[in-house]
Amino acid sequence: MRASVVLTCYCWLLVRVSSIHPECRFHLEIQEEETKCAELLSSQMENHRACSGVWDNITCWRPADIGETVTVPCPKVFSNFYSRPGNISKNCTSDGWSETFPDFIDACGYNDPEDESKITFYILVKAIYTLGYSVSLMSLTTGSIIICLFRKLHCTRNYIHLNLFLSFMLRAISVLVKDSVLYSSSGTLRCHDQPGSWVGCKLSLVFFQYCIMANFYWLLVEGLYLHTLLVAILPPSRCFLAYLLIGWGIPSVCIGAWIATRLSLEDTGCWDTNDHSIPWWVIRMPILISIVVNFALFISIVRILLQKLTSPDVGGNDQSQYKRLAKSTLLLIPLFGVHYMVFAAFPIGISSTYQILFELCVGSFQGLVVAVLYCFLNSEVQCELKRRWRGLCLTQPGSRDYRLHSWSMSRNGSESALQIHRGSRTQSFLQSETSVI
């Protein structure tokens, strides 16, 4: 029973992506430790000691003389879920090695009452972020279809939104696929077919890391776009190619550099360990930079908006435009990484519980919020949907009399309506580009 709890806890704590079943991954790591033990024992001179060096399927024991006690730390393979550090020992007797003492599970802390609460916490977190990513994926897909279907919605702003939606969708897909592989309980394991199949695991991790980084950089692009909209003289549509290079290009270069450092410095396992600091910083530093830059853009945008809203030269329609933009910006920019600033400066392990709740639970619903704000609450989108709905209603049987009635009622005012239409001006570029909500 305890062994199953240990394995379950180990599987839940494999938060990095892997294309190998967790139980097979567990056995593969055991095999790696066994290989290291064999190499270590072969290099040691036993000198006909009473107890030869041995691998007991969990720990490596060096040669010893009769009466000698050998003490080793808890096995490294279980280090992901130690509740406390501990040691285990064996005595060398005339009959050979004694049983391990103290009890392996007790010594390494697996019977700690906190373990069950931790497992419950991880199960709850997984359920929440699975729901969040699923709902986000459905809402983002719906929003993308809506924007693509209506030609009047095709503009630079919405093209950027579509790329942001795609980055959120890829992020959700990578997480859901990763979990379906890691936590699948169906089928019979065939671990003997998988030793050495680290290539697929590494490719999955590369895809996962790329989706995460691309998502951060498209959030940065949204911040850059809003900032450019406020300060630039030229239309920001001319910067769209640069936005594409930032959103998809920079993550590609950074992931390529990370792969190179992994291959040269830490090409071990599934690339989900961080024993060497350089590969870890190569993948983490670009994300930290995007978070900091986006936070700086947020501060700058708020400052510019406050200046424009309090300026005596701004009045009437312009002021309402800036108020609408202020509402949109203040709702959206905090989603673009401001909450990540809370944990960006903290080392790994500090306030890990709160960080998990923010990044997994809150972050999983981020795509849903962005889809609602950028698409479903967008006045242009709502107008197009209403227009399409009215068109569908008019094509239904029984609507002919309604159309004739509407035509006769509108004919009397057609000339005045035409005059109003001719006298109206086209909306300004700023108004058309900032009608987010």
From Swiss-Prot:
The keyword Transcription regulation does not apply. Gene3D superfamilies: GPCR, family 2, extracellular hormone receptor domain, Rhodopsin 7-helix transmembrane proteins. Mainly in the thalamus, hippocampus and in the suprachiasmatic nucleus. Glycans are attached at N57, N87, N91. One of its GO terms (molecular function) is pituitary adenylate cyclase-activating polypeptide receptor activity. Residues 1-22 form the signal peptide. GO terms for cellular component: plasma membrane. It is a multi-pass membrane protein. InterPro entries: GPCR_2, GPCR_2-like_7TM, GPCR_2_extracell_dom_sf, GPCR_2_extracellular_dom, GPCR_2_secretin-like, GPCR_2_secretin-like_CS, GPCR_2_VIP_rcpt, GPCR_2_VIP_rcpt_2. The chain crosses the membrane at residues 124-149, 158-179, 203-227, 239-260, 280-303, 325-345, 354-377. The keyword Glycoprotein applies. Its main location: membrane. Disulfide bonds join C37-C60, C51-C92, C74-C108, C201-C270. One of its GO terms (biological process) is adenylate cyclase-activating G protein-coupled receptor signaling pathway. Keywords: Cell membrane, Disulfide bond, G-protein coupled receptor, Glycoprotein, Membrane, Receptor, Signal, Transducer, Transmembrane, Transmembrane helix. It comes from the Eukaryota. G protein-coupled receptor activated by the neuropeptides vasoactive intestinal peptide (VIP) and pituitary adenylate cyclase-activating polypeptide (ADCYAP1/PACAP). Binds VIP and both PACAP27 and PACAP38 bioactive peptides with the order of ligand affinity of VIP = PACAP38 > PACAP27. Ligand binding causes a conformation change that triggers signaling via guanine nucleotide-binding proteins (G proteins) and modulates the activity of downstream effectors. Activates cAMP-dependent pathway. May be coupled to phospholipase C. Interacts with ADCYAP1/PACAP (via N-terminal extracellular domain); activated by PACAP27 and CAPAC38 neuropeptides. Interacts with VIP; the interaction results in VIPR1 activation. This is Vasoactive intestinal polypeptide receptor 2. It comes from Rattus norvegicus.
